């Protein structure tokens, strides 16, 4: 059996030009949005990078350029579905995924189960294979000042 591990990280800053945020494929009511070329889903972006990294295929930006207008405001679930195809082509399966959302606001806990279900559905895995947790920075740094959100994701693949 062959194992591969990948790590992904993403961060987006808040903007008053949008309302509501999308994290893990779930829309969350908020008075600000996240600035991005796509929908700004920091969790899915980090997850994509983790899987692509584990496959040794670069990063999300290599496959979905942020200068390409076809990806302007696109639903990030599209990226994850495309990366699932890469995973299948390379004949790897997901053992587990562990995600950390770092945000002072809004609160993530009420949305985590919906996020897990959304990601499991796209990746065609069990919800139990995905863990999502959220933390704050105790009001330190740009996240603590509520200027943005960051995520870290680790995934383990096997063949």
From Swiss-Prot:
Keywords: Isoprene biosynthesis, Lyase, Metal-binding
Family membership noted in the UniProt record: Belongs to the IspF family.
Upper classification of the organism: Bacteria, Pseudomonadati, Pseudomonadota, Gammaproteobacteria, Thiotrichales
Quaternary structure and interacting proteins, as annotated: Homotrimer.
Organism listed in the record: Francisella tularensis subsp. holarctica (strain OSU18)
Site (Transition state stabilizer): 37, 136
Residues annotated for 4-CDP-2-C-methyl-D-erythritol 2-phosphate binding in this entry: 10-12, 37-38, 59-61, 64-68, 103-109, 135-138, 142, 145
InterPro entries reported for this sequence: MECDP_synthase, MECDP_synthase_CS, MECDP_synthase_sf
Keyword Iron part of the UniProt annotation: no
Any one biological process term the GO annotation gives: isopentenyl diphosphate biosynthetic process, methylerythritol 4-phosphate pathway
Cofactor: a divalent metal cation
Binding site for a divalent metal cation: 10, 12, 45
Molecular function in Gene Ontology: 2-C-methyl-D-erythritol 2,4-cyclodiphosphate synthase activity; metal ion binding
Co-factor remark: Binds 1 divalent metal cation per subunit.
Chain segments annotated as transmembrane: none
Protein's UniProt name: 2-C-methyl-D-erythritol 2,4-cyclodiphosphate synthase
Pathway noted in the entry: Isoprenoid biosynthesis; isopentenyl diphosphate biosynthesis via DXP pathway; isopentenyl diphosphate from 1-deoxy-D-xylulose 5-phosphate: step 4/6
SUPFAM superfamilies hit by this protein: IpsF-like
EC number(s) reported in the record: 4.6.1.12
Catalytic activity: 4-CDP-2-C-methyl-D-erythritol 2-phosphate = 2-C-methyl-D-erythritol 2,4-cyclic diphosphate + CMP
Function per UniProt: Involved in the biosynthesis of isopentenyl diphosphate (IPP) and dimethylallyl diphosphate (DMAPP), two major building blocks of isoprenoid compounds. Catalyzes the conversion of 4-diphosphocytidyl-2-C-methyl-D-erythritol 2-phosphate (CDP-ME2P) to 2-C-methyl-D-erythritol 2,4-cyclodiphosphate (ME-CPP) with a corresponding release of cytidine 5-monophosphate (CMP).
